Amino acid sequence: MTTAPFVSPSLPRLHSARASPFPKPSVGSGGGVAFPARTYGSSLRLRSAVMSASGVGGNGSPMAPEESTVSSRLGEVKRVTKETNVHVKINLDGTGVANSSTGIPFLDHMLDQLASHGLFDVYVKATGDTHIDDHHSNEDIALAIGTALLQALGDRKGINRFGHFTAPLDEAAVEVILDLSGRPHLSCGLSIPTERVGTYDTQLVEHFFQSLVNTSGMTLHIRQLAGNNSHHIIEATFKAFARALRQATEYDLRRQGTIPSSKGVLSRS
């Protein structure tokens, strides 16, 4: 008896990626939901897991990841004055790579937290008049990071906009709430018990965030819930800020690429 050859059924075709910033997903073989690739200028190849509604494949195990193409949101700033020379690069869609050399060891450690917990790629190279004190370098680095963040965010289409995270570190706990609104405001409720951590003047923590807020145009609230160790309090602050910023900069697929504002615009002007 002759057996007819098996012909694999054709898979449904994906909708065109040009239809909208967030095209309607299609259902692939095995029930997986697949989002078509979308390219914005230069692109970065990332691995994204394609899951069924239950989060597993038909055999009860996670489905194999598929590749999608998304853009990298990048910002780069060079700030040169008679006091400092600062170069900052940030990738909001990074993997948590930190490369910081500021001349202020404790600040380098805090920028590592920003990269690691925000999953941002952060490059900061700075020289300055640290023979006087760390004030000018601390300020100008924060100003440059804020400006790079502003560049990377662009028109802010499709982002969550708001972020909220509380980070503990041993006895310390710090809550951060932020809004990428375009309106700069800082409320900082830290009570750091010592004047220095290593050689770093702890007054500069609030000044760092004020400078970053001024150029990025974010609303930022920092509240210390607990803590009596200065290092722990400051590090918990940077960790909470990183996670809140990560939440705010991530995309909300339900927004379909629209600006998250009833006014239809989020900007400094």
UniProtKB/Swiss-Prot annotation:
Pathway: Amino-acid biosynthesis; L-histidine biosynthesis; L-histidine from 5-phospho-alpha-D-ribose 1-diphosphate: step 6/9. Mn(2+) 2 binds at H135, E139, H207, H232. Its cofactor is Mn(2+). Keywords: Amino-acid biosynthesis, Chloroplast, Histidine biosynthesis, Lyase, Manganese, Metal-binding, Plastid, Transit peptide. One of its GO terms (molecular function) is metal ion binding. The keyword Translocase does not apply. Its main location: plastid. Its EC number is 4.2.1.19. It comes from the Eukaryota. InterPro entries: IGPD_sf, ImidazoleglycerolP_deHydtase, ImidazoleglycerP_deHydtase_CS, Ribosomal_Su5_D2-typ_SF. GO terms for cellular component: chloroplast. It catalyses: D-erythro-1-(imidazol-4-yl)glycerol 3-phosphate = 3-(imidazol-4-yl)-2-oxopropyl phosphate + H2O. It is found in: Plastid, Chloroplast. Substrate binds at residues 83, 109-117, 135-139, 161, 183, 231-239, 261-263. One of its GO terms (biological process) is L-histidine biosynthetic process. Residues 1-52 form a transit peptide. Residues 1-31, 54-73 are annotated as: Disordered. Mn(2+) 1 binds at H109, H136, H231, E235. Binds 2 manganese ions per subunit. The keyword Chloroplast applies. HAMAP family: HisB. Belongs to the imidazoleglycerol-phosphate dehydratase family. This is Imidazoleglycerol-phosphate dehydratase 1, chloroplastic. It comes from Triticum aestivum (Wheat).
